[in-house]
């Protein structure tokens, strides 16, 4: 599901379930802003916990040795940061 599809689903539910009068573009902008805030927090090294959904956290992967298949030589894979997601217990149950 893309960001656009998420915004469209939220838009449809707002109109159907809550009779909210809002434009699709406004919903898309809100969804974009939510993702921007999550990204900014993760880039600062902060944990993002969404109750009932899960937690996003940035971890550092240690450098390791890898293989360049084309050249058949061992290469050093540098340290890098990755985003991990741990679903909440409620998320797993549903």
Swiss-Prot record:
<dbReference type="GO" id="GO:0030527">
    <property type="term" value="F:structural constituent of chromatin"/>
</dbReference>
<dbReference type="GO" id="GO:0030261">
    <property type="term" value="P:chromosome condensation"/>
</dbReference>
<comment type="similarity">
    <text>Belongs to the bacterial histone-like protein family.</text>
</comment>
<dbReference type="GO" id="GO:0003677">
    <property type="term" value="F:DNA binding"/>
</dbReference>
<dbReference type="GO" id="GO:0005829">
    <property type="term" value="C:cytosol"/>
</dbReference>
<dbReference type="InterPro" id="IPR010992">
    <property type="entry name" value="IHF-like_DNA-bd_dom_sf"/>
</dbReference>
<keyword id="KW-0238">DNA-binding</keyword>
<keyword id="KW-0226">DNA condensation</keyword>
<protein>
    <recommendedName>
        <fullName>DNA-binding protein HU</fullName>
    </recommendedName>
</protein>
<comment type="function">
    <text>Histone-like DNA-binding protein which is capable of wrapping DNA to stabilize it, and thus to prevent its denaturation under extreme environmental conditions.</text>
</comment>
<dbReference type="InterPro" id="IPR000119">
    <property type="entry name" value="Hist_DNA-bd"/>
</dbReference>
<dbReference type="Pfam" id="PF00216">
    <property type="entry name" value="Bac_DNA_binding"/>
</dbReference>
């Amino acid at each position: 599901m893309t960001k656009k599809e998420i915004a469209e689903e939220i838009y449809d539910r707002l109109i159907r379930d809550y009779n909210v009068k809002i434009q699709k573009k406004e919903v898309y902008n809100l969804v974009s802003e939510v993702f921007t805030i999550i990204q900014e927090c993760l880039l600062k090294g902060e944990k993002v916990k969404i109750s009932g959904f899960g937690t996003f956290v940035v971890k550092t992967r240690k450098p390791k040795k890898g293989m360049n298949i084309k050249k058949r030589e061992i290469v050093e894979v540098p340290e890098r940061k990755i985003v991990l997601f741990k679903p909440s217990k409620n998320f797993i149950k549903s």
